[in-house]
Amino acid sequence: MDIRHLTYFLEVARLKSFTKASQSLYVSQPTISKMIKNLEEELGIELFYRNGRQVELTDAGHSMYVQAQEIIKSFQNLTSELNDIMEVKKGHVRIGLPPMIGSGFFPRVLGDFRENYPNVTFQLVEDGSIKVQEGVGDGSLDIGVVVLPANEDIFHSFTIVKETLMLVVHPSHRLADEKECQLRELKDEPFIFFREDFVLHNRIMTECIKAGFRPHIIYETSQWDFISEMVSANLGIGLLPERICRGLDPEKVKVIPLVDPVIPWHLAIIWRKDRYLSFAARAWLEHTKSYLWDPKKDSKG
């Protein structure tokens, strides 16, 4: 039994098909079938029930699946550590971040980092905070930028932004000249929301329900600039972070502080507590922490 046997076994179990596993791994189906058969003979057990083209794990197969995942994870961690030793200052970092902050301060941070580590490459994945947390959780991303809260049992984190949400309306809106606005005043308004895979979707929905109403959502999007454009076309209202509002055209939209309640928008960088981070990822975290982190932002209260 070797790592290749376990890799083939896990892929067949995941896809429930020898054919699909062979396509995924770019090897012939007979090769995979032979590997699995050899593994079963070596262990003296059946790992799969064969039912035509569909395969299912046996009870022994389920136990094997759990253990094989841990073995592969440990092997990958070992490989990463050895690569660090052999290839210092080289690597690839996968970062997930919400679309609304991608063009903000991160190009500057990445640019400065590249001056010191020119051989480190990056994959930037723009998505809502919920999906970013899932990506860091399942290992498809190394590091994530998310809207808090994040699961403190799973992730390390440090806070980089502490702001609140602001109301954005058309200049002709009845509230356009107000100094501040209470959330309950918006109960009859058409809302333009972020999608459900954004933390702000659930955050705003929860606060509206607490204020005594369920918001009338006419559009959902993943892009903050779409929200501002829809508001400027007088098609609805939006709630956006202060950082975004500072860049909006005051001739097209009006920004009003939202009070009672104040809805926080806190951004943090997260990474898994139980997963090995490559040299490149650790170096980027340290660089970003020195660049963006303010210890006061992580203080309680």
Swiss-Prot record:
| Top-level lineage group | Bacteria
CDD domains per the UniProt record, alphabetical:
PBP2_CidR
Q: Which UniProt keywords apply?
A: DNA-binding, Transcription, Transcription regulation
Is the keyword Transcription in the record?
A: yes
Q: Which Gene Ontology molecular-function terms are recorded?
A: DNA-binding transcription factor activity; sequence-specific DNA binding
The processes (GO biological process) annotated in the record are: regulation of DNA-templated transcription
Which SUPFAM superfamilies does the entry link to?
A: Periplasmic binding protein-like II, Winged helix' DNA-binding domain
CC per GO annotation: cytosol
Domain annotation HTH lysR-type: ranges: 1-58
Q: Which residues bind DNA?
A: 18-37
**Spans traversing the lipid bilayer:** none
Q: Does the keyword Membrane apply?
A: no
Q: Which protein family is named in the record?
A: Belongs to the LysR transcriptional regulatory family.
NCBIfam families under this entry? trans_act_CidR
Q: What is this protein called?
A: Uncharacterized HTH-type transcriptional regulator YwbI
Q: Which organism is it from?
A: Bacillus subtilis (strain 168)
Q: Which gene encodes it?
A: ywbI
